[in-house]
């Protein structure tokens, strides 16, 4: 996270004057960025729920939510309160441990993914050298939670839903990783911050979506499948499997699956923004994020720093929510594919395309001086 040294020194002096121990300040200084990010993700989930309901209503020529606050903006809060008030039921013949741990295995990896997602230069919880691989590795754990939840329910529909989730994840995780491998050589790094910085030279035309158009399309399709969104929501197909792995769940555990679904969609949109859409960089160079020294401003001025950070976050979120709008609109316009079509698309189409796209990129980078 961005840390202002003057502010840090002022806070330390204030803590000493109030008589608080130094360890308490260190704990608060570490936990504050995490809580801030968690609050931001929570607000992002609420916005996604509202957008999804409104976009689906527009596609189907309905009004959508309008009673839960102005224009229905607190519909997510109403849904959460409803789920909290419902009874939490555990199947008598199911495995209670696996049944309880399944939703946790789904939710935790999604929130861990936000550790390596930057919203601006320095606005990141953990700038790892293997940031994009960390995101792929963590996101691949969630389907194991779905499989665990389905198996622990001791229900044939739940078990089939969990097996479908595992098969779907394996089919699309490899093309997704190959798409990331195609982007990484362009910046000579696996760090998410370095990948964004490598796209900052030429504005709109410097984005990786122009240098990797095939990879961008493959990444978009694979991310939809990873998020289990229509037309790839086969693990929870209501017409075939009642509700898939969610069949036996109720109350807060049922809500945890939706708590994981919407942040996962936001994570995929932010990842697409970072890898292919230039991240926090403006489409037009120096228009919205000017160099402060060129304007005669002091680059250490706190006001200028706050303005730069705010604009970077706005640009990143604008790109992410534009990508997210396409994902939501796709859900309500395309029909669900069959299981064999899903696997054929992953293994016979996306995998060869992603592999063929990564080989020329790697060869060019190795041959270039």
Swiss-Prot record:
The protein's matches in InterPro entries, at most eight in alphabetical order, are given as: NADH_UbQ_OxRdtase_su1/FPO, NADH_UbQ_OxRdtase_su1_CS
Instruction: State any single GO MF term.
Output: oxidoreductase activity, acting on NAD(P)H, quinone or similar compound as acceptor
Asked if the Swiss-Prot or TrEMBL record annotates the protein with the keyword Thylakoid, the reply is yes
Q: Which residues cross the membrane?
A: 25-45, 104-124, 130-150, 270-290, 306-326
Write out the GO biological process terms.
aerobic respiration; photosynthesis, light reaction
This molecule's function is given as: NDH shuttles electrons from NAD(P)H:plastoquinone, via FMN and iron-sulfur (Fe-S) centers, to quinones in the photosynthetic chain and possibly in a chloroplast respiratory chain. The immediate electron acceptor for the enzyme in this species is believed to be plastoquinone. Couples the redox reaction to proton translocation, and thus conserves the redox energy in a proton gradient.
The UniProt entry, under PANTHER family, shows:
NADH DEHYDROGENASE SUBUNIT 1 (PTHR11432), NADH-UBIQUINONE OXIDOREDUCTASE CHAIN 1 (PTHR11432:SF3)
Q: Which family does it belong to?
A: Belongs to the complex I subunit 1 family.
Write the protein's name: NAD(P)H-quinone oxidoreductase subunit 1, chloroplastic
């Amino acid at each position: 996270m961005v840390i202002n040294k003057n502010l840090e020194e002022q806070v330390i002096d204030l803590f000493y004057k109030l008589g608080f121990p130094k360890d308490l300040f260190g704990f608060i200084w570490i936990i504050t960025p995490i809580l801030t990010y968690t609050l931001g993700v929570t607000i992002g989930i609420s916005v996604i729920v509202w957008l999804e309901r409104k976009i689906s209503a527009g596609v189907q020529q309905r009004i959508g939510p309008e009673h839960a606050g102005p224009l229905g903006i607190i519909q997510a809060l109403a849904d959460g309160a409803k789920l909290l008030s419902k009874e939490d039921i555990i199947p008598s013949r199911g495995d209670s441990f696996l049944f309880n741990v399944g939703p946790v295995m789904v939710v935790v990896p999604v929130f861990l993914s936000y550790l390596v997602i930057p919203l601006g230069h320095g606005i990141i919880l953990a700038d790892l050298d293997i940031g994009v691989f960390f995101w792929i590795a963590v996101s691949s754990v969630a389907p194991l939670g779905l499989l665990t939840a389905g198996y622990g329910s001791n229900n044939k529909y739940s078990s089939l839903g969990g097996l479908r989730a595992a098969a779907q994840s394996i089919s699309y995780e490899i093309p997704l990783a190959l798409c990331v491998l195609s982007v990484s050589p362009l910046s000579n790094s696996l760090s998410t911050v370095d990948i964004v910085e490598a796209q900052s030279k030429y504005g709109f035309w410097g984005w990786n979506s122009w240098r990797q158009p095939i990879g961008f399309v493959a990444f978009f399709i694979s991310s939809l499948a990873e998020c289990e969104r229509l037309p790839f929501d086969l693990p929870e197909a209501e017409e075939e499997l009642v509700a898939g792995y969610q069949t036996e769940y109720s109350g807060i555990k049922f809500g945890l699956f939706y708590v994981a679904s919407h942040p996962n969609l936001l994570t995929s949109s932010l990842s697409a923004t970072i890898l292919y859409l230039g991240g926090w960089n403006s489409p037009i160079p120096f228009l919205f994020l000017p160099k402060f020294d060129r304007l005669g401003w002091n680059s250490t001025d706190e006001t200028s720093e706050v303005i730069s950070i705010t604009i970077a976050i706005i640009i990143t979120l604008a790109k992410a929510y534009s990508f997210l709008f396409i994902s939501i609109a796709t859900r309500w316009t395309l029909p669900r594919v069959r299981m064999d079509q899903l696997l054929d698309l992953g293994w016979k189409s996306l995998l060869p395309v992603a592999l063929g796209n990564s080989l020329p990129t790697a060869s060019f980078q190795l041959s270039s001086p």
